[in-house]
Each structure stands twice: as C-alpha cells, then as structure tokens.
Amino acid sequence: MAIKLEDKKAIVAEVNEAAKAALSAVVADARGVTVGAMTGLRKEAREAGVYVKVVRNTLLKRAVEGTQFDVLNDVFKGPTLIAFSNEHPGAAARIFREFAKGQDKFEIKAAAFEGQFLAANQIDVLASLPTYDEAVSQLMSVIQGATSKLARTLAAIRDQKEAAAA
C-alpha cells in the first residue's frame, strides 16, 4: 500500500520529534507477534512513558538523521518496531525484554543511549539502570548507613573518654 508524500513527511516529523525528546531507543523485529500481544505491549509502553511505533525503514532513517539515534541506521532492516524512552532511559529496554520472554518471535535488534550503539546482547545493561526513585532510594540508604556509622563511632569515643575519666 503506497503512502502519500504528505503522510510520509508527517510520519518522519512525528518520529523525529519523538527521537529528539527521547533519552534512549530500542529497535525490535515483531514479525509473527499477534495483534493482541502488540496491543498489550503498546499499552504497557504508554503507561511507562515510552513511544512505540512501527515505521518503514527508509522513513525511520530520515527521522533519526541528525539525532543521537542515527547510530541505529544499520539495524533498520525488515519490519522495524522502535521504542523511544521519554522519562527513564531503561524503560523501553525493560518493557521489550519482559515482552520478549513471553514471545518466541519477538526479537530485540539493538538499542541506543547517549549516542552509543548497544547490541542486542547489551540490552540488559540499559534495562538494569535504576529508575529515578530507585536511584534516590539507593543514595539515601548509603547516606543513612554512613550517618549511622559516624554516630556509633562518636558514641564509642564518648564512652571511651567517660571510662578513662572515671
């Protein structure tokens, strides 16, 4: 089915805007995945602030041109499903990784983060990045641990001085 030039320009502009606003991108091949499963994937992605779209490769190459995601141009072969993470860099990678576990035919091709190409076997690195809330929680636990250790040390010094004075 042929797409009119105006429609192609609109698709390129839409995907380009999504790419400019995104923190990371993940590319997958969704051949053979049922419509119901894809609908579930899109719903989950929407809830996580991830933009998901199936785009023709030539249009996708034009859309990511000049963005940090043009490193993905070599993997735009065959049916391409692209996901841009807008709120957290690992969101799309996590969603795709979990979805791939239940779908035999769903294949993650690659990802890009901060202009760096990540092969399919490196997706776990991106997916394992902590969310903002998780990172703050980890930082607070480190600070709390250091504060507790300092308080115990000061109490031990005080007790030692009191024992020496008595």
UniProtKB/Swiss-Prot annotation:
Any one annotated GO CC term: cytosolic large ribosomal subunit
Gene Ontology molecular function: any one: large ribosomal subunit rRNA binding
UniProt superkingdom: Bacteria
Keywords, comma-separated and alphabetical: Ribonucleoprotein, Ribosomal protein, RNA-binding, rRNA-binding
Annotated Gene3D superfamilies: 3.30.70.1730, 6.10.250.2350
GO biological process: translation
Function according to Swiss-Prot or TrEMBL: Forms part of the ribosomal stalk, playing a central role in the interaction of the ribosome with GTP-bound translation factors.
Alphabetical list of HAMAP family matching this protein: Ribosomal_uL10
Family, similarity comment: Belongs to the universal ribosomal protein uL10 family.
Quaternary assembly: Part of the ribosomal stalk of the 50S ribosomal subunit. The N-terminus interacts with L11 and the large rRNA to form the base of the stalk. The C-terminus forms an elongated spine to which L12 dimers bind in a sequential fashion forming a multimeric L10(L12)X complex.
Name by which UniProt lists this protein: Large ribosomal subunit protein uL10
Gene encoding the protein: rplJ
